[in-house]
UniProtKB/Swiss-Prot annotation:
<dbReference type="GO" id="GO:0005739">
    <property type="term" value="C:mitochondrion"/>
</dbReference>
<comment type="function">
    <text>Possibly has a role in RNA transcription or processing during stress. Binds sequence non-specifically to RNAs and DNAs. Mediates cell-to-cell trafficking of RNA interference (RNAi) signals (small RNAs (sRNA), e.g. small interfering RNA (siRNA) and microRNA (miRNA)) which regulate growth and development, as well as responses to environmental inputs, including pathogen attack; can compromise zucchini yellow mosaic virus (ZYMV) and tobacco rattle virus (TRV) infections at the early stage.</text>
</comment>
<feature type="modified residue" description="Phosphoserine">
    <location>
        <position position="43"/>
    </location>
</feature>
<keyword id="KW-0496">Mitochondrion</keyword>
<dbReference type="GO" id="GO:0035197">
    <property type="term" value="F:siRNA binding"/>
</dbReference>
<dbReference type="InterPro" id="IPR000504">
    <property type="entry name" value="RRM_dom"/>
</dbReference>
<dbReference type="GO" id="GO:0009651">
    <property type="term" value="P:response to salt stress"/>
</dbReference>
<comment type="subunit">
    <text>Binds to small phloem-mobile single-stranded RNAs (ss-sRNA, e.g. small interfering RNA (siRNA) and microRNA (miRNA)) in the phloeme exudate, including viral-derived sRNA (vsiRNA).</text>
</comment>
<dbReference type="GO" id="GO:0005615">
    <property type="term" value="C:extracellular space"/>
</dbReference>
<keyword id="KW-0964">Secreted</keyword>
<dbReference type="GO" id="GO:0003723">
    <property type="term" value="F:RNA binding"/>
</dbReference>
<keyword id="KW-0809">Transit peptide</keyword>
<dbReference type="InterPro" id="IPR052462">
    <property type="entry name" value="SLIRP/GR-RBP-like"/>
</dbReference>
<dbReference type="InterPro" id="IPR035979">
    <property type="entry name" value="RBD_domain_sf"/>
</dbReference>
<dbReference type="GO" id="GO:1900864">
    <property type="term" value="P:mitochondrial RNA modification"/>
</dbReference>
<dbReference type="GO" id="GO:0003690">
    <property type="term" value="F:double-stranded DNA binding"/>
</dbReference>
<comment type="similarity">
    <text>Belongs to the GR-RBP family.</text>
</comment>
Length: 136
């Protein structure tokens, strides 16, 4: 994370010499992503509250969310935990990655931003013969 701090300092120097818009939002994204964790391997019984409780000993948890299937409402087995500072997030990774939570071994690492490729709600995507298919 020292890299992020150094990058932040370099970018701030550039900000003082140019407009704040894009660089400021980029700094915010870097800071946000460096304190947001992906938590995989969650049991079906883990909810937002129990996920947050499992991570509060490492620092102030600003958000804890278990991702659910849109149609069934059932947990998809992963979630995200956000901390107010990146040191807390780093400590949580060190201490919780590979540990057991609600009977399942979990994986904990820094969250990465989703790719910006648009997602189609009409299926598609290949299969035999290529062409994608699906949709209207």
């Amino acid at each position: 994370m020292a890299f992020c701090n150094k990058l932040s300092g370099i970018l701030r120097q550039g900000v003082s010499q140019s407009s704040n818009g894009p660089v400021t939002s980029m700094l915010g994204s870097l800071r946000y992503m460096s304190s947001k964790l992906f938590v995989g391997g969650l049991s079906w019984g883990t909810d937002d509250s129990s996920l947050k409780q499992a991570f509060t000993s490492f620092g102030e948890v600003t958000e804890a969310t278990v991702i659910a299937d849109r149609e069934t409402g059932r947990s998809r087995g992963f979630g995200f935990v956000s901390f107010s500072c990146e040191d807390s997030a780093n400590n949580a990774i060190k201490e919780m990655d590979g540990k057991e939570l609600n009977g399942r071994q979990i994986r904990v690492n820094l969250a990465t931003e989703r790719s910006s490729a648009p997602r189609s709600s009409f299926g598609g995507g290949g299969g035999y013969g290529g062409g994608g298919g699906g949709g209207y």
